[in-house]
Amino acid sequence: MAIHLYKTSTPSTRNGAVDSQVKSNPRNNLICGQHHCGKGRNARGIITARHRGGGHKRLYRKIDFRRNAKDIYGRIVTIEYDPNRNAYICLIHYGDGEKRYILHPRGAIIGDTIVSGTEVPIKMGNALPLTDMPLGTAIHNIEITLGRGGQLARAAGAVAKLIAKEGKSATLKLPSGEVRLISKNCSATVGQVGNVGVNQKSLGRAGSKCWLGKRPVVRGVVMNPVDHPHGGGEGRAPIGRKKPVTPWGYPALGRRTRKRKKYSETLILRRRSK
């Protein structure tokens, strides 16, 4: 990823950075409109997810997470920007004439060939079942349910590791540090998702954050008591509690939010690390 730093002409561009090489030129048959209603509101218009709203209009790119074009070689034609995710996408031209978008694997360049199937080489960008991969393989775009398409490790820079295979299940270490079991018949893509340094790029100003649909975040300690439990006081006052709480009074630090009786509880061998 080539980062272009702005010249220090104005305060808003003094610390800004953009990608100078990756552009967006989507194909008409691989995009569709999406209706963003609410933006953090429920059916009654009440805010249910804070700090969301606004943002630039987007066209959705149809990404091939299933990789079900078996044993057909494809060639990477372009590497494009996708406004709906922080990872880049690749336009693939397959040998049968079909064109699809996939997530851009780290290190893949224009002209590389990829393929998906059961007996394909362990090469970056190839998709194959976990049962055909050797231990220690770095993977992304991992299926949870067979045939449903990849659902895990799809963000920029995400990578999981295949650490064991026993019986009908494979043991994976996910990017969060969680260790869990997944069926060996599920597919995954070899390699790491590209655009690794996206979290190190500085937007430079608040307006760039608003273009992404993210609203400002206000600290509770500067609010009034009617708006937040941390609010109130004369001048710069402490929160007045032993531990921080959420705007609704629940503990903000250390509280577990996962449901206890979830179906996948028996599949998780080690909880994610913070």
Curated annotation (Swiss-Prot):
Localisation: Plastid, Chloroplast
Keywords carried by this UniProt record: Chloroplast, Plastid, Ribonucleoprotein, Ribosomal protein
GO terms, biological process: translation
Region (Disordered): 1-21, 225-274
InterPro entries assigned: NA-bd_OB-fold, Rib_uL2_dom2, Ribosomal_uL2, Ribosomal_uL2_bac/org-type, Ribosomal_uL2_C, Ribosomal_uL2_CS, Ribosomal_uL2_dom3, Ribosomal_uL2_RNA-bd_dom
Pfam families tied to this protein: Ribosomal_L2, Ribosomal_L2_C
Chief location of this protein within or outside the cell: plastid
SUPFAM superfamilies: Nucleic acid-binding proteins, Translation proteins SH3-like domain
A Gene Ontology cellular-component term: plastid
GO molecular function, one term: mRNA binding
NCBIfam families linked to this entry: rplB_bact
Family from the record: Belongs to the universal ribosomal protein uL2 family.
Assembly behavior: Part of the 50S ribosomal subunit.
Name of the protein in question: Large ribosomal subunit protein uL2cz/uL2cy
High-level lineage: Eukaryota, Viridiplantae, Streptophyta, Embryophyta, Tracheophyta
